[in-house]
Regions:
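Extracellular low-complexity Ser/Thr/Asn/Gly-rich intrinsically disordered segments
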Residues: 3-356
Length: 356
């Protein structure tokens, strides 16, 4: 075993004939040349793709690692090949035929061996690259966002807060950025995002949610429906009138008296009655019959008509009116007639006391 002293060294070989008894010999020079193996990057970056088919497999372009592996070496002087195991890489056997479009054979994570060979000396070096298939964000289908047609009633457009859907979509997941789009194409390309408050362009309207992993950049999309529900159309009722027996402006009312007229045949409507507009708007502190008015003579209460399915409501006013009772004199003069036939009965004209 001889250890070289330099990359290129001359040694001498003595050749002596062993068949003769003389000491005759000759010698020749032997030049020993030691070529370096390629000095490559032995820790190249991972190659990552997104798991578009959710099966752990993806399409990789292995050549994307070429520049990093060569680490400054002239690519025209070296040949790079890829292998699925170390033995093949060492023996230059069974290279990956399509490194520009390679599908991993081990789901999610796989090691690939890289062989870099000098085109002149045939010296080579090997390293590995890691392939990673990143999972897509899991987005949960949200329920539609529903608004009532309160602004410009009848135009079926409202201003939506799109972020109201995020909690349902993520279900507590973190590290996922959510954005909203009008088309699937925009969602896929991450172009033309829309923002809150967002006014729908049709009723109902489907928009698209993109959830992107903050680290891997992998994304999923899902749809979100926007709906504008009509508000009830209660009829304005006639005043409810009750007699005021003591003429103090107060009495008891049956506030539900006009319920059928107010609902006017509309389905899925429930009514509640309130002393103030604020209470009616908030659906709190309803009043029930018999109701004793708190404003003398004439009082306005507020009727909330609410759809039991959508929760949308409208409010109409209901007037309560107290009617004064006739005031009778404390003493009315007696009507006296004669009992001509002495039988205790007679005919009386009661109208003669009308003016009294």
């Amino acid at each position: 075993m001889y250890k070289r002293q330099a990359y290129e060294q001359t040694i001498y070989v003595r050749v002596e004939d062993t068949t003769i008894t003389t000491d005759c010999f000759s010698y020749v020079e032997l030049i020993i040349i030691v070529n370096d193996v390629p000095q490559i990057n032995t820790e190249p970056s991972y190659l990552e793709v997104c798991d578009d088919n959710t099966d752990g497999f993806g399409l990789f372009d292995l050549s994307l690692s070429n520049e990093e592996v060569l680490d400054g070496l002239d690519p025209s002087e070296f040949t790079i090949t890829y292998y699925e195991n170390a033995e093949n890489a060492e023996n230059a056997e069974n290279p990956i035929i399509t490194p520009f479009a390679y599908t991993n054979v081990t789901p999610f994570n796989q090691t690939i061996w890289v062989r870099v060979e000098n085109n002149t000396t045939n010296c080579y070096n090997t390293t590995t690259i890691e392939l990673t298939v990143n999972e897509l964000p899991v987005l949960i289908q949200p329920t539609p966002l529903n608004l009532c047609d309160y602004i410009n009633t009848g135009d079926e457009t409202e201003e939506f807060t799109l972020e109201d859907s995020i909690e349902q979509v993520l279900q507590g997941q973190t590290g996922i950025n959510i954005s909203f789009y009008e088309t699937q194409e925009d969602a896929d390309n991450d172009t033309n995002p829309i923002f809150s408050p967002y006014t729908n362009t049709s009723n109902a309207q489907t928009i698209y949610i993109r959830g992107e992993n903050e680290i891997t950049g992998c994304y999923s999309t899902i749809t979100l429906d926007l709906r504008v529900n009509p508000i009830p159309s209660p009829a304005v009722p006639q005043a409810i009138e009750e007699c005021d027996e003591d003429n103090d402006g107060f009495t008891f009312f049956t506030v539900e008296q006009n319920e059928v007229d107010i609902i006017n045949g509309e389905l899925d409507i429930v009514l509640s009655y309130h002393e103030t507009l604020t209470n009616a708007e908030n659906g709190i502190e309803p009043i029930i019959s018999p109701y004793y008015n708190i404003v003398p003579d004439s009082q306005i209460i507020f009727v909330r008509a609410e759809n039991t399915i959508t929760g949308c409501f409208s409010i109409v006013e209901q007037e309560l009116v107290t009617l004064p009772s006739p005031e009778l004199p404390l003493i009315i003069e007696d009507i006296i007639v004669c009992d001509d036939d002495y039988d205790g009965t007679a005919i009386f004209d009661l109208t003669q006391r009308d003016e009294d």
